[in-house]
Curated annotation (Swiss-Prot):
Domain of life according to the entry: Archaea
Protein name: Elongation factor 2
Cell compartment(s), UniProt: Cytoplasm
GO molecular function, one term: GTP binding
UniProt record similarity statement: Belongs to the TRAFAC class translation factor GTPase superfamily. Classic translation factor GTPase family. EF-G/EF-2 subfamily.
């Protein structure tokens, strides 16, 4: 039992020695559906590393170090820890990230995956593979992160469901089968077979994080342990003995070391997926090998505000060695910054280290301008392409208005809000410059509840929060006629039409396969081959709105002075896309096309104050003549319920405009998959519980945007406009432009 019980001070020198050898490093993290036991599992690992007393492991939630996390017994942010572990006579460094399981916090999962090579997927033995399990496994596989499986809460099968040893075995095989089905569905083709988990090979652990024991099949066979022995341990009260003989931390760390690849192996297949540069260049080769002597390249995965040290950027060193005092160049922000301090994490504590080589996770002080998703490089490498942009699965669809009780403290509140958005880019902050109104949007009500709680902690000022409002999107259903937008001084004329942007292009923008920064020829090729675009039109793209998924295309030829006002037209386009003409909701899936222009020769008469309104007004007129409509966000519900209650659960869903997509039945459980408007989801929890007498599990996650029902559209838009203090009547194109 001497595997890893030494305390961190003694370990620092040893950790640095191991950090120089990529073969002895593992970068992994927990991934799971909410409440399946990730953080309790991670606590068990901390105990094994001597960082947590055995008495409190399983109860401590040590990785939940934001006070509200311990209060709610759930993880809302991703936390890091470096663990020292001896296996097979060799010391290893396991850099571990604990991530949230609640659907409202998938943004934290997305960012964590960039630094991981392996994901320990924790599944509750009773609930099995749930929606969020599917989401995080899919995200992991998109980032080429290899999953291994821990089936947790085996005690529930024995104590709650009272299953026999044979039935427990059957339940485990069902979960493994469901898990492998996800890998079959989402894994990159070359890993579909290699990455499926096999209990016989020790790629699946079973246990109870609460009772601190865990085994794999090879371990059980070696020790002569049978399922009947585990059932006996619970029934006869000697479960502590299981924890002593088969400590969970040892089982999980062994599984991670055996089945999660080291950085120098993982980077060989991850770098071609995460980075579009030349793999044969000096920096490309260094990253493929995780070479500590190569040029410095770091992918930033998160940024946190420290009250004493300012902004701390955490990321993975993919090549080179970062040292205190080094200069780094932030690609995309085009600036150099000096690293003032380098750290590794021990839960909430940052430990200062003199350097950190390739393959490791590091925290940096001094690079204040860096943001999650940024790439930091050696200052000589200013032309190197950055890592692929991160793709967030959930979109901010719920909004609250925030107002300081004391107007004099507005600036203080805004400052704290801006810091929150830096830390969590899935939050969306809008401040109306004229009215001073602050709108904060998140992916769900819980996301906003936690954000406002953190705001209260940090801003140290009182404020009010409005009831949550749902965000909608505006779009068009057909091509409009051409509309003329005149500048306020009447010296410039711009001619636009709009049409729906096809779903394939929207998906290419969402997955970052096409971006504004891309080489226009490369982008045109992708659009031609995958979305059927005409080559000239694809090359004419001026800007891509990757926040709301719209594009602006220039189809003009030979217009004098057009190049000089291009940036102002793009700014006008972005302005129009942020709040459309129907109800000031963001536009989505719109292609804006410029077909002609008359531009004044004198720069004084064609500035932004002239060109931006002309652009916006013409776009608004075009939108209103293209059968505009509202899109509402839908959530997907995955429901497990006792078969007797299917009827009552279905009627609750029907009452809330829900639609059942799929239904299957097994011996004890019925499985329903449904879609439901977010607008209808606020009270659904209590109603479902009541309808099924509490015998129900369900999970929700953002599914898609769908047109609001046509029969109710006009009344609903009027209602929405009234709420926002706008004139109730829907505007006409002529409210924005003169007919020409």
């Amino acid at each position: 039992m001497s595997s890893a019980v030494r305390i961190v001070e003694k370990q620092l020198d040893e950790i640095l020695a191991i950090a120089r050898n990529p073969a002895q490093i593992r970068n992994a993290g927990t991934l799971a559906h909410v409440d399946h036991g990730k953080t309790t599992t991670t606590d068990s690992l901390l105990m094994g590393a001597g960082l947590l007393s055995p008495k409190v492991a399983g109860k401590a939630l040590a990785m939940d170090f934001v006070a509200i996390e311990q209060l709610r017994q759930m993880t809302v942010k991703a936390a890091n820890i470096s663990l020292y572990f001896e296996y097979g006579g060799k010391p290893y460094l396991v850099n571990f990230v604990d991530t949230p399981g609640h659907v409202d916090f998938t943004g934290h999962v997305t960012r964590s995956l960039r630094v991981m090579d392996g994901g320990l997927v924790v599944v509750d033995s009773v609930e099995g593979v749930m929606t969020q399990t599917e989401t995080v496994v899919r995200q992991a596989l998109e980032e080429y992160v290899r999953p291994v499986l821990f089936i947790n809460k085996i005690d529930r099968l024995i104590k709650e469901l009272r299953l026999s040893p044979q039935e427990i075995q059957q339940r485990i095989l069902t979960i493994v089968k469901d898990f492998n089905a996800l890998i079959d569905m989402f894994a990159p083709p070359e890993f579909k077979d290699k990455w499926k988990v096999d209990p016989a090979k020790g790629q699946v652990a079973l246990g109870s994080a609460l009772h601190k024991w865990g085994i794999t099949i090879p371990m059980a066979q070696k020790a002569g342990l049978k399922f009947s022995n585990i059932v006996d341990a619970y029934e006869k009260g000697y479960v502590d003995k299981l924890g002593e003989e088969f400590p969970l931390y040892k089982t999980l760390l062994t599984m991670i070391i055996e089945h999660v690849p080291p950085p120098n192996v993982a980077q060989k297949y991850r770098i071609p997926r995460l980075w579009r540069g030349d793999l044969n260049s000096e920096v490309g080769k260094a990253m493929l090998e995780a070479d500590p002597n190569g040029p410095t390249v770091i992918a930033v995965s998160k940024v946190n505000k420290d009250p004493h040290a300012g902004l701390i950027a955490t990321g993975r060193v993919f090549s080179g060695t970062i040292r205190e005092g080094d200069e780094v160049y932030i690609i995309g922000r085009k600036m150099k910054k000096k690293v003032l301090q380098t750290y590794i994490y021990m839960g909430p504590t940052r430990i200062i280290v003199p350097y950190m080589p390739a393959g490791n996770i590091v925290a940096l002080m001094g690079v204040d301008e860096a943001r999650a998703g940024d790439t930091l490089v050696d200052p000589r490498l200013t032309e190197v392409p950055p890592f692929e942009k991160m793709r967030y699965i959930a979109e901010p669809v719920v909004t609250v208005a925030i107002e300081p009780k004391n107007p004099a403290e507005l600036a203080k509140l805004v400052e704290a809000l801006k810091d929150l958005v830096i830390e969590d880019p899935t939050l969306d902050l809008k401040i109306d410059q004229e009215t001073g109104q602050i709108l904060l949007s998140g992916v769900g009500t819980l996301h906003l509840e936690i954000a406002t709680w953190l705001l209260k902690e940090r801003a140290k000022t009182e404020f009010t929060v409005s009831p949550p409002l749902i965000r909608f999107r505006e779009t068009v259903r057909e091509r409009s006629q051409v509309w003329e937008g005149k500048s306020p001084n009447k010296h410039n004329k711009l001619y636009f039409y709009v049409e729906p942007l096809d779903e394939t292009t929207v998906e290419l923008i969402a997955t970052k396969e096409i971006t504004e920064e891309q080489d226009p020829r490369e982008r045109a090729k992708i659009l031609r081959e995958k979305a059927g675009w005409d080559t000239d039109e694809a090359r004419g793209i001026w800007a891509i709105d990757d926040r709301y998924f719209n594009v602006i295309v220039d189809k003009t030829t030979g217009i004098q002075y057009l190049r000089e006002i291009r940036d102002y037209i793009v700014q006008g386009f972005r302005w129009a896309m942020e709040a459309g003409p129907l109800a000031q909701e963001p536009m989505r899936g719109v292609k804006v096309v410029l077909v002609d222009a008359v531009v004044h020769e004198d720069p004084a008469h064609r500035g932004p104050a002239q060109i931006m309104p002309a652009t916006k007004n013409a776009i608004f007129a075009a939108v209103l003549s293209a059968r505009p409509t509202l899109l509402e966000p839908l959530v997907r519900l995955d429901i497990k319920v006792a078969p007797d209650y299917i009827g009552s659960v279905t009627s609750v869903l029907n009452k809330h405009r829900g639609k059942i997509l799929d239904m299957t039945q097994q011996e004890y459980m019925a499985y329903l998959r449904a879609e439901l408007p977010v607008l209808e989801s606020f009270t659904i929890s209590d109603e479902l519980r009541a309808a099924a007498a509490g015998k129900i599990f369900w999970s929700m996650q953002f599914a898609r945007w769908a047109p609001y029902p046509e029969s109710m559209l006009v009344d609903f838009v009027k209602q929405l406009r009234k709420k926002k203090g706008l004139k109730e009547d829907i505007p006409k194109p002529t409210d924005f432009v003169e007919v020409f």
